[in-house]
Amino acid sequence: MGRPVNKRVGRHLRLAACLSSGLMDVGLLASGTATTLGFGVSAIAPVSAQAQSLNLPTAQPTAQPATSPTAQPAARNPEIKVGIVQRFGDQKDDKLTLGSLAGDQLTVSFETSGQAQTVTTDRLQIDITMQPLPTPVLEEWVVLSTHRSFESAEDSAIRWQAAGINAEIAQPDAWQVWAKREDYNSPLVRRLLLENLHAEGYTRAFLDSRAVKEVPKVAFTANGFKYVRDAFTITSANRRIQLAEGNRQTFRDLYAGDMKIQPNAYGTYTLVNQVPVELYLRGVVPHEIGPGAPRSAIEAQAILARTYVLRNLRRFAIDSYEICADTQCQVYYGLADADPGSNAAIAATAGQVLTYNNELVDALYSSTTGGVTARFTDVWNGADRPYLTPVVDSLSPKWDLAARPLSDEANFRAFIALQNGFNEEEWPAFRWNRTASLKEMDEILKLYLKNRQHPLANYNQLLDISVVERAASGRVQKVTIETDQGSFDLVKDEAVKALVPPRSLLFYVEPVMEMPPATKPADNDSTGTSLGEPTITLADLAEGSNEEAGVSETPVEDSTSEASETEAEQTPDPILTGFRFIGGGFGHGVGMSQTGAYNLGEKGYSHQQILEFYYPGTVLQPISKAVTFWDGD
């Protein structure tokens, strides 16, 4: 959001306590306010002054933050809940096969008519059956904001909460902040909320509605019998479970701990792995930094991965698990590809976490910084972290950020032109140059806008992309997109989500111009430029020779001069065909650079020195009662 949420909106709209109980059914809505969606489903039409005139009591805002703090003391090796298959049931043919190791068996625990029941087997198949509904059901929620990252979504949720609108963080695809469904649980209340938000200027909020005619139901088959249950737990005596996805009959993955199939907030199911954190790290560390890294770099990665997961256990509260298994959290592949060197690094640092003022740090890291790390607020909304400040990723004094901040465009382009003297210089992602055609850019941008129900989602022509603001670390803070229907801004990490060609926020952009095909090519002309030949930029045109501009300094006869003038008049203007993005780095660039840590490790840096380099002022200590996992911002 661009401005603080108006508290008057929250006071006026927290209506659930007095309305929800009587308006749960669409059919119970007041006469004259319902419309039909098309398959027999009724929904409330947008609420007008009639609804606003209702004398509705207000509920007081709660002081509780949008996400619950995890400030309790922790065990040395706590168990965590990881969503390893997050959207099981998205496809009708989704399948999972679970198996025990030789000599062991799986125990499946579930309920039948309220009674606990168990089944023992060595192999379990889980699949989906689509269940038609007798009548379509209206499924909807109010989306208050949409984000690329959890970090910005959490900041938005906290702001809405402070304004008196209970909010929850969801991830149906992109991260979103929803008006809390149990509070805004009737069509009338949701539409009243949305109308008032729009009236107050929060026009990016929208109602995500759909009529559901069938729902996925999960079932498992064991010992020749099929059981349809919404939730069940899978355990084994040695706490090792094999997994195969799809139609594979052979097991590729092995997980420690227990498994559970459970419903999520999106009408599908999640396979959750409950696992001790030290065993979890064996499935993270070798995939995050690679087994070929120097030992000290792997140890630093192990400490960061441990710190990161324990601080972020609140991410999926809406779905009743804690962390995911992909790059939105940390990649996690279980034990199948565990590496002896990584296991040794994990064991050597067991229980150690990185802290600041006895609280776990926000242990962010990325592949490659591009030569300079970013401040937290250079990438996301929220409060700055004192230990996440711009650091030039070099062991030599390559650049003085205080004297030459990269917020200045000339300074930034000079910095990006540097190729040598950095910790990451030998890695391909350190510097890059990527071009996308107008067609490719249109597809990317229109999908981004459509998913956010943006009014410009159906623009006809993309005219320009320009960086209008940078941070001192060089990260793009605002990009303006100009179309034939109007312009809009992309702020911070939304630029990477919407544009795609940039691999980080450390970039500048140039239009790609091409000469159109000649309408009447000369018989002997073999040097004309066509759409299939090399492109030129506006900078190329500006720096071109006088001859390229159609002006000759050599005296010529009148007839030739007249011909030249005629040719110049007929020369078409170059046309925009795409955009070129020039930059450096891969990922958000906050905290440790994994490729930079490689170099530091090779130079003899210990894991303590690597962590101090990227997180100045932090303290390494064991998990204890004195350490707070997360106490909110």
Predicted regions and their residues:
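Conserved, single-site charged/polar hotspot
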Residues: 2-633
